Amino acid sequence: MTFDPLSQDSPKDKKFPPSMVGLEIDSHGALLNGVLYIASGENPHPTMLLLHGIPGHERNTDLAHIFRRAGWNVVVFHYRGAWGSGGVYRFTHILEDIQVVLDYFRSPDIVARHRIDPEKVIVVGHSLGGWAALMTAANGFVDSAASIAGLNMGVWGQQLVESPELARSALRDTILDVGIAPLSGLDLDNEIADIIQNHLAWNPTQHGDALSKVNLLLVAAKRDTALPVFDHHFPLLEALKNSPSVKSALLDTDHSFSDSRIALAQTLLDWLRTV
């Protein structure tokens, strides 16, 4: 029996139905909270970490349900200091937290408990989460990753290096405008210092060799005013233009894909079939 996970419910499995469980995962002494959406069926499932941006108003849970119907386990969690997770919010912590969560879902007891295929654990991220997904892949922690309207942190860093005061003011406004109330302990001066210090290491275009070996999907939004494609998307495409494992899509929508959720889901579903 075939069905369309985009528009139809999955076939009923009374013995191994779809479900969800709350998560509390220790990361460097702080508890990360989140949810695991478990796909139906007895066999081990591929599993994705679905990473949100800053602060994380858009969590893409509509995508999580679609991907679960398509046979994927989906993890939606909050980084340290975000949305009630313990600890302090910092960009450096985000990358560390992702590694911790990947290790957690590859551990033998969790693999057995939640019917996970440990050889197929990937990352998919939106905005800041897209950058984090790319950096996680570049550092060799996954062999498949997708970035949705992904940030290039290196672009922010280069702007801070070249025009410190102007860029500092603009970046402060950008981060404050998205709303930082859900972020505990955020210190913009510390974040800006980290971005400057890591402006090359945190630029995905500097990791072309590593990313060219990854099964990669880059989805961008043509009308993205938060992270314009000419700064954050096209330069990375150019850096990876000779890699056959890199796929891309440009949708006519805004940063949150507000009027293109179905098109976004279909683009990702098509790519997931190649993972």
Segment roles from a protein language model:
Residues S184-R273:
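Serine-hydrolase catalytic core
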Residues M135-N190:
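Hydrolase active-site cap/lid region
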Residues Y89-R115:
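Alpha/beta-hydrolase active-site loop
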Residues V111-S127:
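Alpha/beta-hydrolase fold nucleophile elbow
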Residues A64-G86:
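Conserved alpha/beta-hydrolase
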Residues P44-G53:
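Short beta-strand element of the alpha/beta-hydrolase
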Residues G53-I66, F230:
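The serine-hydrolase catalytic nucleophile loop
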Residues M1-E42:
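N-terminal cap/lid segment of alpha/beta-hydrolase-fold proteins
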